[in-house]
Curated annotation (Swiss-Prot):
Name the record gives this protein: Lysosomal cobalamin transport escort protein LMBD1
Extracellular side: 1-7, 69-97, 163-185, 324-361, 427-483
Keywords: Cell membrane, Cobalamin, Cobalt, Cytoplasmic vesicle, Developmental protein, Endocytosis, Endoplasmic reticulum, Gastrulation, Glycoprotein, Lysosome, Membrane, Phosphoprotein, Transmembrane, Transmembrane helix, Transport
Motif (WTKF motif): 291-294
Quaternary structure, from the entry: Interacts with ABCD4; this interaction induces the translocation of ABCD4 from the endoplasmic reticulum to the lysosome. Interacts with ABCD4 and MMACHC; this interaction ensures the transport of cobalamin from the lysosome to the cytoplasm. Interacts with INSR, adapter protein complex 2 and clathrin heavy chain.
Keyword Metal-binding: no
Organism: Rattus norvegicus (Rat)
Length: 537
């Protein structure tokens, strides 16, 4: 019992160290992208905190799996200390952890982040007082609070199972509803709300992560255009525009006024000339920068990283395809959320994670790598696509020049994507997320030649969805993810959409040429001349 307690403490200590690493990563990540001129303390802290909570929630996944696996021996029997009370206590500890973290996520998504966002939107108007800003922000935030309340009510009051008897009265149905409400409906309400956010995260992952998984490695492999060649092209463009301006101005040398068309063309040419000269300054700065020379020396390493990332992307895509194909061929159908009893088509990650889970914390390391990979590929997708509302581009994400409102949007999207990674990992390795490395005993008839008869032998078998409930403990993560079958069905179809968008993004990324070393300078009219270092990085 003492050894078991010591091992459990070690597991939670590693989780604590991971919390510190997450906070450090979020601080560096947010500071890297926030604008140096428009930096706001509240928006920065909000972005760091919300992203950290999402990552901490994902970090709880391997702890959950480790705890349910650690209660059983490899031969399928429970350990001596793992009685019913201890098992329930461990499950409740993880469950309360999820309750706390998911409640904080709901608070961030439906109150704090919208409030801070609308507060800074009102702050742009210099005529308004702080009191007016707070009142206006609270007024707009109230709409998000109402949405959150509706989601909680729907999750709590809508029963999953109504009476099967068609002759049952309405009173019996209402009675069953309130009986269900008193039995764990807090879990159902929270699960419904989080699943709704995860569904939005799935859409964000389809839009940004799927494209970023192809764009990031190919951009690393292709690299950027030559700075010297870009300067030469830019110089030629400057000379051409200056000559065009001189031609237009020569028309008014004799005192005649320019026509409206010539004045409009002259104005456009002058704006174009200012942009080209601004590009020239930045190109000159980058060409002479020591950072550019250092990055040039690291070019082979970037190619290696690009090849590694594309191989990892192909591994994920193949695993996700095989997992979805298994559900399409062998699942219990859409009414069950495409649950699969057993594993009929194995995929690489589904085989690897249960093996690593037996040697703690190797699965921790792999899960961390997967989550960070999703973060970086999502960030690559957001940087390439931008933040859009239908056909309207709201914000651009630029290193060192992201506005506070855009930073909040960015962390909101990443928070939702990280929420969805738990289901993505389940899709890649359903057995691992559901039961870890648990085994249970089944009786097998064996024919013995020595005794001229049959004998019964208990043999261990890996836990799956068809296993007895009293023999295999389901992770709390799985309980949250699959409380409502229709969300699981939506995730299943979303995985197919994810694969399609990845293939489209792969084709688009292959067809696109190399990026400019000052990508986005033409679009940023608010770029000041004292910020060239943002591009040099």
């Amino acid at each position: 019992m003492a050894a078991a307690a010591a091992d459990l403490v070690i597991g939670w200590c590693i989780f604590g160290l991971l919390l510190l690493a997450i906070l450090a990563f979020c601080w560096v990540y947010v500071r890297k992208y926030q604008s140096q001129r428009e930096s706001e303390v509240v928006s920065t802290v909000t972005a760091i905190f919300s992203l950290a909570v999402a990552l901490i929630t994902s970090a709880l996944l391997p702890v959950d799996i480790f705890l349910v696996s650690y209660m059983k021996n490899q031969n399928g029997t429970f350990k001596d200390w793992a009685n019913a009370n201890v098992t329930v206590q461990i499950e409740n500890t993880v469950l309360y952890g999820y309750y706390t973290l998911y409640s904080v996520i709901l608070f961030c998504v439906f109150f704090w982040i919208p409030f801070v966002y609308f507060y800074y939107e009102e702050k742009d108007d210099d005529d308004t007082s702080k009191c007016t800003q707070v009142k206006t922000a609270l007024k707009y935030t109230l709409g998000f609070v109402v949405i959150c309340a509706l989601l909680l009510l729907v999750g709590a009051f809508v029963p999953l199972n109504l009476p099967n008897n068609n002759n049952s009265t309405e009173w019996e149905k209402v009675k069953l509803l309130f009986e269900d409400l008193g039995t764990g409906q807090g879990l159902a309400a929270l699960s419904f709300s989080i699943s709704s956010l995860t569904l939005i995260g799935m859409l964000a992952a389809i839009t940004y992560t799927a494209y970023g998984m192809s764009a990031l490695p190919l951009n690393l492999i292709k690299g950027t255009r030559s700075t010297a060649y870009e300067r030469l092209e830019n110089t030629e463009d400057i000379e051409e525009v200056e000559q065009h301006i001189q031609t237009i101005r020569s028309k008014s040398k004799d005192g005649r006024p320019l026509s409206a068309r010539d004045r409009r063309t002259l104005k456009q040419c002058e704006e174009r000339l200012r942009t080209l000269r601004k590009r020239e300054r930045h190109l000159e700065f980058i060409e002479n920068s020591w950072w550019t020379k250092f990055c040039g020396a690291l070019r082979p390493l970037k190619i290696i990283w690009g090849i590694f990332f594309i191989l990892v992307a192909l591994l994920f895509v193949i695993s996700l395809f095989l997992s979805n194909l298994d559900k399409a061929l062998h699942s219990a159908g859409i009414d069950s959320g495409f649950i699969v009893f057993g594993t009929n088509l194995s995929n690489p990650l589904n085989m690897l994670l249960p093996l690593l889970q037996t040697v703690f914390p190797l699965d921790y390391i792999l899960i961390t790598i997967i989550i960070m990979y999703f973060i970086f590929t999502s960030m690559a997708g957001i940087r390439n696509i931008g933040i859009w509302f239908f056909w309207i581009r709201l914000y651009k994400i630029r290193r060192g020049r992201t506005r506070p409102q855009a930073l909040l949007f960015l962390c909101m999207i990443l928070l939702l994507i990280v929420l969805h990674t738990s289901y993505m990992i389940y899709s890649l390795a359903p057995q691992y997320v559901m039961y870890g490395s648990q085994n249970y005993l089944i009786e097998s008839n064996i024919t013995s030649d020595a005794h001229k008869g049959n004998s019964t032998l208990a043999v261990p078998k890996r836990c799956d969805a068809d296993a007895p409930k009293d023999q295999c403990t389901v992770t709390r993560t799985y309980v949250f993810l699959h409380k409502f079958w229709f969300f699981s069905a939506a995730y299943y179809f979303g995985n197919w959409a994810f694969l399609v968008v990845f293939l489209i993004g792969l084709i688009v990324s292959c067809c696109k040429g190399k990026k400019s070393v000052i990508e986005g300078v033409d679009e940023d009219s608010d770029l000041s001349d004292d910020e060239p270092s943002a591009y040099s990085a």
